[in-house]
Each structure stands twice: as C-alpha cells, then as structure tokens.
Amino acid sequence: RDDYCSTSKWRFRKIINMVFGNTHTSRYTMLALVGLAGVVYCAMHLMNGFLMKSIEISDHINFLYLPSFLRLVNVLVLGLVWGTLGTAFGGILLCFWTNDSFPMALWNIAASASSAALAILAMRILQQRTLSLTKLSDLLQLALLYALLNALLHHLLWATLDPSQLVSPNQVAYMVIGDLNGAILGALALRWVATHTRLVALIRQRARTTAD
C-alpha cells in the first residue's frame, strides 16, 4: 500500500509539473485557470441562490454566501491581477441571469471583483508582511476585513446609483454576516489544501512567474 501511495504521489507531481512547469505555455495556463475560476464562481453563485433561497434577503444578499470565499481564493491563489480577472469573468457570465441593468451589473462586478484584492492589500499594509495560507488567524482576519469592505462597497454603490437595492436598514450587517460565513468556510478549506498538498503553492508560483 505504501508503494502504491508513493507511486500515486509521484504521478500527481509529474502531472502538475507538466502543466505548470512549461514557461512557454504558462500564460495560456493562467488564462485557462482564470476561465475555470470564472465558471466555478458563476456555478457556485447560481447553486447558492437555489440552495439558500430560504435565508435570502435579496438577489445580492444572503445569510450564507458561499461564493464569497471563491473571490478570496481566486486572488490568494492566482494573484491580485489574475484572481480579480477570474472573479470578474464569473460576474460577466452571471449577467445572463441577473435582473439588474447591464451598467449596474458591471458596477456590481467591479465591486465584487475588487473587494477581495483590496482586502488583501490592506492586510499586507497592516501586517507589513505577506499573508500565510496555512495560518488560520491570517485567513480569519482576512475574511472579516473582506466581508466588511465588500458590504460597504456594495452599499455605497447602491445608495449612489440604484437606491432600489436598499431593501432593509440592516442590510449592510446582513451582507457582512453572509459574506463572512462563506469566507470562513472557504478559508478553512483553503488552509487544509495548502497544508496537505503542494497544488496551491505550485499555482501561486506559476502566477508570479507569469506576472513577471
């Protein structure tokens, strides 16, 4: 059994190196990952709306919003630029299901895609170091900061451009709770993957190499 596990791990590493180790194809690989991130984000959003309909406040607010962690994961794993593009692509796909006007949908996409990147930049400034994906306190603080920023960005956007989205005097708090719940679940999952596999580290390394 030990020999079988060792062989399986060797094959897994070989596949990962074939995918991420070729500099010539690294940019195409990142574009593919951005596309995959967008599709997964879109699918998760639609699934969340279906499964969590009973605790939904509006089309944009839910007491458990699972895709919020994908916004963080995209940026933490793919990097600020590629990760933000992945979330933005997913938001564009969701335009086919939204009831918002197209300009308003684009503003919502901008707020959703940028909130995770802004939270990470703020954490780096506050902590004066790079975030650790295996340090639970880092991920929980990031989840809280992201939830606050995302809710405030959307509330400011809606209050300015689309007051019809203001459905409750407590909706900022509701949105923070929903985003925080989803982000914490995702942070725990990401920490487990980063601790027990090298997949996250390899993707992050390839993202940095491509950016350079």
Language model features with spans:
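N-terminal amphipathic/basic-hydrophobic helices that include classical n-h-c signal peptides
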Residues: 1-15
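Hydrophobic transmembrane-helix microenvironments that flank and shape a buried ionizable site
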Residues: 64-65, 76, 176
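Short, charged juxtamembrane terminal tails flanking transmembrane helices
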Residues: 201-212
